[in-house]
Amino acid sequence: MKERIVNLETLDFETSQEVSLRPDLWENYIGQEKIKNNLQISICAAKKRQESLDHMLFFGPPGLGKTSISHIIAKEMETNIKITAAPMIEKSGDLAAILTNLQAKDILFIDEIHRLSPAIEEVLYPAMEDFRLDIIIGSGPAAQTIKIDLPPFTLIGATTRVGMLSNPLRDRFGMSFRMQFYSPSELALIIKKAATKLNQDIKEESADEIAKRSRGTPRIALRLLKRVRDFALVKNSSLMDLNITLHALNELGVNELGFDEADLAYLSLLANAQGKPVGLNTIAASMREDESTIEDVIEPFLLANGYLERTAKGRIATPKTHALLKIPTLKSQSLF
């Protein structure tokens, strides 16, 4: 399947530009108001006590701002942030090297934390609880454990698959936050702020149109903004008006609901099953996608907006999906 413009993965060429568009203060961070309020209280209390923050876990679909909010936390705490991803921590020595280089009150951000191996988790437990690193030297009867004290630090874990975290690891986070999809009005504000940083004039209705097609996700909103800006440049227009925006979005294959070819193929597969549950492995094989992409990228937005039901036997299209695709339902169809 061709590359999706609404893909939620961060592309290499986007990274530096995304950093420049990242909010650096609470007042510039749009959305997630409940999380922001709780964090501001925790940060204020920690600074008054002159302590590090409790360890915290952010979970939810990709592209909702877990990394951005972690950078703001570090700035508010006036400390450093070290960013890594679980797949990069292959051996206990990798984790030990990271932990022993942290300073007091530093923040360690681990993305995809659900992918840590059990052996790495075992090393992490005493580090999180007691700020202590237990290193085993040797093997068998001659093995020795060396204990190394660590400075108080804050671990921030980010995951799209919170259900895959082991209970012992999940229980060691003092705070846990579920990131929510953004409203169109929040996304429109994010788009306008980003356009200003890019020195790009944009009409209000154009920002609204991009927001409407961004699947509730800032990462997609910013990606669409940059692609529409390209179309405006080719058209020799300094202004992103509605006509250019609509033309660009239609050319990119993103419809009024934010669905692209992959979403419609997924929904068609379910709707044509006429009420019979379709298993994840069947969907993945039919779409030539891996199961994690189906679960983490395609399904969350569709689930949140009522286009499918998950059952023990598989996925089922809802009447909303049948109405969208104009595929009639059999009278005997039931979700149960």
Swiss-Prot record:
The record's catalysed reaction(s) read: ATP + H2O = ADP + phosphate + H(+)
One biological process term from GO is: DNA recombination
Known CDD domains for this protein?
AAA
Q: Where is this region: Large ATPase domain (RuvB-L)?
A: 1-182
Identify a single GO molecular function assigned to this protein: four-way junction DNA binding
Name the UniProt key words of this record, in alphabetical order: ATP-binding, Cytoplasm, DNA damage, DNA recombination, DNA repair, DNA-binding, Hydrolase, Nucleotide-binding
Residues reported in the UniProt entry to bind ATP? L21, R22, G63, K66, T67, S68, E129, D130, F131, R172, Y182, R219
* SMART domains (alphabetical): AAA
Its domain comment says: Has 3 domains, the large (RuvB-L) and small ATPase (RuvB-S) domains and the C-terminal head (RuvB-H) domain. The head domain binds DNA, while the ATPase domains jointly bind ATP, ADP or are empty depending on the state of the subunit in the translocation cycle. During a single DNA translocation step the structure of each domain remains the same, but their relative positions change.
Q: Which HAMAP family match?
A: DNA_HJ_migration_RuvB
What is the protein name stated in its UniProt record?
Holliday junction branch migration complex subunit RuvB
Q: Which organism is it from?
A: Helicobacter acinonychis (strain Sheeba)
